Amino acid sequence: NADSDDFIKISPNRISPIVLKKEHKNVVFTSKNAVEAILTSSSAAELKFENIYCVGRKTRRFIKNKFGKVAHFENSATDLAKYLVEFMEGSEITYFHGNISLEDLPKILTENNITVNPIEAYRTKLSGKKIPEEVKGIMFFSPSNVESYLKENSADKIAYCIGETTANAAKAHFKEIKVAKIPTVESVIDLVN
């Protein structure tokens, strides 16, 4: 028996046409939400993104459908940052992100003399909702899901997490945490089953 709630609400920011009309050699998206937010301000055909880098398979698939190509993807922002330090052409990136985002990627890039131009593409609003006590486990797909869930609920359940970053957010509160082998929704569901 399963029920679904995101515990968060996403709202795209309006991004200046001046920013979106200029050419961007290296662009980074750490979530599908950021890509969707950009596409509310401009069509994919109008955007001049030379190399698109991203985190996550779902984000990669979405970008391929909208833009046609992804230069490289990794399953975590830290792994992507390490890749960019090693292999990216140029010394500057445009980083589309949400208002609640981890600093790992920009920190690693900046420490390695890569200029990061951050653009807040969307806002995440935590919208905690009370869950029935009999629920035994909760699936989390982002650290902000964990934070929002904890606003209205206790941590006496099993936390099923999409990846290590989300699991790290859960570790401070939950006793039992299970992490998907591959960071996909399907893998988290497999964990539960």
Residue ranges and their predicted role:
Residues 1-193:
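Signature of uroporphyrinogen-III synthase
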